[in-house]
């Protein structure tokens, strides 16, 4: 009885006259000698995964548990029998399939660490062992790159929701928290019409928009600039000195609204739009390797100046972003950036502009 109710949930239903396909599947990544067994989907002509590289797996059959489905699909597609495996998470897919209809699917993700048997030819495509560090060179769905990383990093059991529109990943939610997406820009700083999840942007080095807000005060010998020290928990350049306040422009947002929000979130400064003076645009690239992952940053920044009186003892710092702040003479800062006098992620040519 309970199964019949469950089965009814994952049948076709109608919304405003259009069918929504619903189902449950498994996807399995088999590992051996630091390689994954990947399936290149090139055999079927009408295949939503045509030419993509994926793991092995498929749809549940009547009465199957996730493990039943996993064992059966792995045997059918590879000839192997898993002997050690992890149930890594649930991935929810919502896709328009490039049509006016939606498909809604729940996928059980498995990492198979040990197995027995010999690999056979697969009717779904071509099986190939691929070194883990070369997986990202393959033609993967963008969302696959996210759950592959979570699987590889062995994060606790997770729930990931992926939304696709006309084949492009347009939204993702990890354990109930929406992931951030950016507009992808061309070389002239214009929006291309594509959006992309934040971590994938920094894996690929895509051009994206940011805002930089410099807080400046006049002194007897020139100007002081307010620097923030990035939190040690930051995913890039932890513990480095940086611009007074900065942030990414989320997909669909504008630079000024982003700058006002970042000032308030990071420092507790509630500025008025007219108090932020746009001084220039800046394009910069800065790469690194953090926590074992390559980080490629290529940004086009709208740079603002804020010159209202600021008492740093009264600032409300966002602790997960900012460890501390301090004033520094502008010329001294330029010299320290040049000679590496302080750990920093500041663009020298930007701070020299004003």
What do these predicted ranges mean?
Residues 121-180, 239, 245, 280-354:
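Nudix hydrolase/Nudix homology domain
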Residues 36-76, 164-177, 198-210, 221-261, ...:
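Conserved Nudix-box catalytic region and its N-terminal flanking loop in Nudix hydrolases
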Residues 48, 99-102, 218-224, 293:
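Short, solvent-exposed loop/turn segments that connect beta-strands within catalytic domains
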Residues 79-117, 132, 232, 268-312:
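Active-site segment of metal-dependent pyrophosphate-handling enzymes
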Residues 10-28, 33, 177-220:
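Acidic, metal-coordinating catalytic segment for phosphate/diphosphate chemistry
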Residues 30, 109-113, 129, 215-217, ...:
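Short, well-ordered beta-strand micro-motif
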Residues 61-96, 100-103, 212-216, 256:
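Short, well-structured hydrophobic secondary-structure segments
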């Amino acid at each position: 009885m309970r199964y019949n109710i469950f089965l009814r949930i994952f049948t076709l239903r109608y919304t405003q006259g259009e069918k929504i396909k619903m189902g449950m599947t498994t996807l399995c990544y088999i590992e051996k000698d630091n390689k994954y067994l990947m399936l290149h989907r090139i055999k079927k002509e009408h295949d939503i995964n045509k030419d993509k590289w994926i793991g092995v797996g498929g749809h549940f059959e009547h009465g199957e548990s996730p493990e039943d489905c996993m064992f059966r699909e792995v045997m059918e597609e590879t000839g192997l029998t898993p002997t050690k495996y992890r149930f890594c998470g649930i991935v929810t897919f919502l896709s328009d399939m490039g049509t006016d209809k939606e498909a809604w699917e729940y996928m059980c993700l498995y990492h198979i660490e040990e197995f027995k048997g010999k690999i056979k030819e697969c009717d779904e495509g071509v099986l190939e062992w691929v070194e883990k560090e070369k997986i990202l060179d393959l033609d993967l769905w963008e969302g696959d790159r996210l759950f592959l990383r979570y699987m590889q990093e062995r994060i606790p059991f997770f729930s990931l929701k992926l939304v696709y529109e006309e084949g492009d990943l347009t939204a993702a939610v990890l354990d109930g928290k929406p992931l951030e997406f950016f507009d992808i820009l061309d070389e002239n700083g214009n929006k291309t019409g594509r959006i992309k999840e934040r971590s994938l942007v920094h894996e690929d080095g895509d051009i994206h928009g940011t805002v930089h807000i410099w807080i400046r005060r006049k002194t007897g010998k020139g100007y002081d600039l307010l620097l923030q020290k990035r939190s040690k928990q930051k995913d890039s350049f932890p513990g480095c000195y940086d611009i007074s306040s900065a942030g990414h422009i989320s997909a669909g947002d504008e630079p000024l609204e982003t700058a006002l929000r970042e000032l308030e979130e990071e420092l507790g400064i509630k500025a008025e739009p007219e108090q932020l003076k746009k001084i220039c645009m800046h394009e910069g690239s800065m790469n690194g390797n953090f926590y074992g992952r390559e980080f490629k940053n290529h940004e086009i920044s709208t740079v603002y100046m804020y010159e209202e009186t600021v008492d740093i003892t009264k600032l409300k710092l966002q602790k997960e972003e900012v460890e501390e702040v301090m004033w520094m003479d502008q010329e001294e800062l330029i010299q320290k950036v040049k000679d590496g006098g302080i750990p920093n992620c500041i663009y020298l040519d930007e701070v020299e502009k004003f």
